[in-house]
């Protein structure tokens, strides 16, 4: 039986696709999972046993550069012996600097490397190892910064969604709650803007339109502060910290205001939840903007840059959307058409074929 190691770490945007890939492969191949300490907090170790290889970000802090460099070399040694001990046949990397030691060692040990790029901009580590990879799993042929000479390495699939999502109940495209239920997702990083600005938007909206809020908040203290504000003026609310199983909240959501991580926005499209994307402006290579722009160009969402966000303008837009629902329902129908071919079995068969044919 072929052995696959899936390497991940860092933010939820790297980890969630990794555990989905693990679920796709575990029945047909001997499958292993590695992460760094940051990524480990997003993983249920009981369901997804993983080995921790902690990789420091060498370029982040010049003061502790020598120490980080030493840790980096330690992670290379650890990666080398792990790959050799497990006799891995394929390394599947979800990108990020935490993948560097394993990819380097896989190259040395002549282990086949498969990369995964869910974003519309080629990540830096993926770009570095593209030359040495067998294939790169993507959702589109039109990825920015992708070298033309390696276009033949792209392996296209429909967007990766967790298996539980396919079994979840999806509402009709013509349904809407009274009052409307809005989901606010700040992501696993850069959520402070959502805690402050979007909560002010919610309070302003409530002055003109009754609504119900489900909101991801960055920490417990802010949950208490926001909950108090919402309760004082009578806004029905459900506030929570980052949640790997956020899909359990999707079933009766009418609208979302969200960051533009690839996993999150593809899940919203699959559930036919119209959304306003506000990309995280500090995301590497501005990839969140291009993730959202790709869907915006297909008439699947609305898009505004964080530096262009004005509470009064966004409030006016949302109120008009609630009054004239034609555009709202049009988005839902477009989402339904876009997602109808995305099935677990279709993606699963393609991913298995990828391993068997390489």
Residue ranges and their predicted role:
Residues 6-9, 27-71, 186, 305-307:
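Conserved nucleotide-sugar phosphate-binding/catalytic loop shared by glycosyltransferases and other
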Residues 14-25, 38:
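Short amphipathic alpha-helix
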Residues 23, 34, 40-48, 166-170, ...:
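Donor-nucleotide binding loops and adjacent catalytic segments primarily
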Residues 61-90, 108:
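An amphipathic, basic-hydrophobic alpha-helix
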Residues 88-90, 251-266, 273-274:
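Acidic donor-binding loop of glycosyltransferase active sites
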Residues 302, 307-339, 357-358:
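Conserved donor-nucleotide binding/catalytic region of nucleotide-linked donor-dependent transferases
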Residues 340-358:
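C-terminal alpha-helical cap of glycosyltransferases
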